[in-house]
């Protein structure tokens, strides 16, 4: 299938499903049978295991697996629970999610960077640090796809698997913890988490984790570099004489459009329309030779789009069950949310993990009576604030204060979506839990190849370039356990253990 036909099919599908999703109102969680969480577990286990058992079978059949399992909860909600609005709501979130990462994927594929100079350990650390910052501007997907090829080229004479692993650690995951330009934090932004709140709240955790991981990389790369220097010098000299090259710089404009579109909230379809327009503009104005140099094709984003149709559909019963039963499973402390979100992010995927534990925190702490009181205050524009006599009056006031601070336009309009009220309760009363969920989901996404969307894309690009990458379990045993787990344990000890 040609890229044009593929793009046309995706665009038409998005238009159709967007019309359905945005037509549905916001619905509350439904009481579901625990067995309905089974398709979610089966799909995520299949994603983690089946490609390593039979890669060819998986490549041929993963669309049927994802869509087939996804249809089970859709049918259950529509016909058994009579709550089709819940699926329409999650469809809206899926569309926002896939349009964002898809547009970043297309635009970043139109930028070709070639970096000249010597591949030294300090140069590599600098490039990774730049990538960490870029991940907060372009999203982890955009930064990863723009920088992985230059990173591979500059290290091509001494490239080892650990170079790519640490690239995944820093650029594809930990680096992007400060802004919601990409999953999983973008999903929280859609629920009402303010854009700049994350940066203001966790920058020091981000800095500590980043410094530790980069320091470990510097030690390992220094050892590798010394071994390389003892080898043939002509390889090093030939690299120094290669010219720097930048092509497709007009795509920076389209990246800016996508980033700016993240801030667009009304009308509800405009953000996605701007992103799709930017992606189309980038694709059709980029010279084919640039796409060829970047080995650009739609395969990776097609796989992500199809798999996440199944993930988003099957995770709804798990989200609803956790929201309504969080207390019964013993989740009470911020540290438990940190490790719980982290483990689920590492072994499954950090986007659904973030939503699962956000739902759990809402179910554990947010009382429907508080929501009703806050909605009354919003509708009356704060009238009667001093007359609140509930035993949870402070929580009500704190929630309304958070709404007024972070969502003044919604408060002024006199109507606030349920999810925004729920998130504002956490912001005003239990912000440590929201920090734990945010940090756990982003950081631990680096623990496996399937922890975050860009991980597999980066691995695939590296393998196409001839890099011998560690296996699924080799990645965990050689890098996650000795490097990441002690780092994340330190973050827990410093900020979440109490």
Where are these regions (language model features)?
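Hydrophobic transmembrane alpha-helices of multi-pass small-molecule transporters
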Residues: 2-109, 117, 204-323, 480, ...
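Hydrophobic transmembrane alpha-helices that form the pore/transport pathway of multi-pass ion
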Residues: 122-174, 356-439, 465-470
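Long, structured ligand/cofactor-binding scaffold of large enzymes
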Residues: 80-153, 157
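Hydrophobic, small-residue-rich alpha-helical packing segments that form membrane-like cores
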Residues: 143, 156-198, 202-203
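Juxtamembrane and boundary regions of transmembrane helices in multi-pass small-molecule transporters
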Residues: 178-179, 188, 196-239, 390-394, ...
């Amino acid at each position: 299938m040609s890229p044009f036909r593929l793009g046309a099919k995706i665009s038409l599908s998005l238009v159709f499903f967007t019309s359905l999703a945005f037509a549905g109102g916001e619905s509350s969680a439904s009481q579901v049978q625990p067995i309905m969480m089974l398709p979610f577990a089966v799909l995520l286990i299949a994603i983690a295991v089946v490609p390593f058992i039979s890669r060819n079978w998986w490549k041929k059949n993963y669309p049927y697996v994802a869509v087939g399992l996804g249809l089970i909860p859709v049918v259950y909600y529509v016909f058994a629970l009579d709550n089709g609005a819940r699926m329409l709501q999650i469809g809206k979130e899926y569309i926002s999610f896939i349009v964002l990462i898809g547009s970043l994927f297309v635009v970043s594929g139109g930028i070709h960077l070639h970096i000249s100079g010597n591949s030294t350990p300090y140069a590599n650390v600098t490039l990774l640090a730049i990538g960490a910052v870029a991940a907060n501007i372009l999203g982890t997907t955009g930064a990863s796809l723009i920088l992985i090829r230059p990173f591979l080229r500059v290290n091509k004479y001494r490239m080892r698997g650990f170079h790519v692993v640490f690239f995944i650690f820093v650029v594809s995951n930990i680096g992007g913890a400060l802004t919601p330009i990409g999953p999983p934090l973008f999903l929280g932004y859609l629920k009402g988490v303010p854009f700049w709140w994350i940066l203001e709240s966790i920058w020091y955790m981000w800095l500590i984790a980043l410094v530790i991981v980069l320091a470990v990389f510097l030690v390992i790369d220094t050892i590798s570099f010394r071994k390389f220097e003892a080898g043939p010098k002509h390889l090093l000299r030939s690299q120094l004489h290669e010219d720097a090259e930048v092509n497709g710089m007009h795509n920076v404009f389209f990246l800016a459009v996508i980033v700016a579109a993240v801030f667009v909230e009304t009308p509800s379809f405009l953000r996605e329309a701007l992103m799709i327009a930017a992606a189309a503009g980038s694709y059709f104005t980029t010279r084919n030779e640039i796409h060829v140099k970047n080995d650009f094709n739609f395969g990776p984003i097609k796989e992500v789009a199809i798999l996440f149709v199944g993930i988003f559909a099957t995770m709804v019963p798990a989200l609803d069950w956790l929201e309504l039963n969080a207390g019964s499973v013993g989740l009470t402390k911020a540290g438990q949310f940190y490790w719980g979100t982290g483990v689920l992010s590492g072994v499954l995927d950090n986007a659904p993990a973030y939503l699962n534990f956000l739902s759990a925190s809402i179910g554990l702490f947010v009382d429907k009576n508080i929501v009703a009181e806050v909605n009354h205050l919003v509708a009356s524009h704060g009238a009667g604030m001093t007359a609140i006599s509930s035993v949870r009056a402070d929580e009500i006031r704190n929630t309304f204060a958070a709404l007024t601070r972070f969502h003044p336009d919604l408060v002024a309009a006199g109507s606030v979506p349920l999810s925004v009220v729920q998130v504002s309760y956490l912001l005003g009363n239990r912000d440590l839990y929201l920090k734990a969920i945010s940090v756990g989901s982003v950081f631990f996404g680096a623990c496996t190849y399937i922890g975050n969307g860009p991980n597999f894309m980066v691995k695939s690009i590296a393998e196409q370039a001839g890099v011998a990458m560690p296996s699924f379990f080799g990645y965990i045993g050689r890098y996650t356990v000795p490097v990441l787990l002690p780092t994340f344990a330190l973050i827990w000890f410093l900020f979440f253990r109490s």
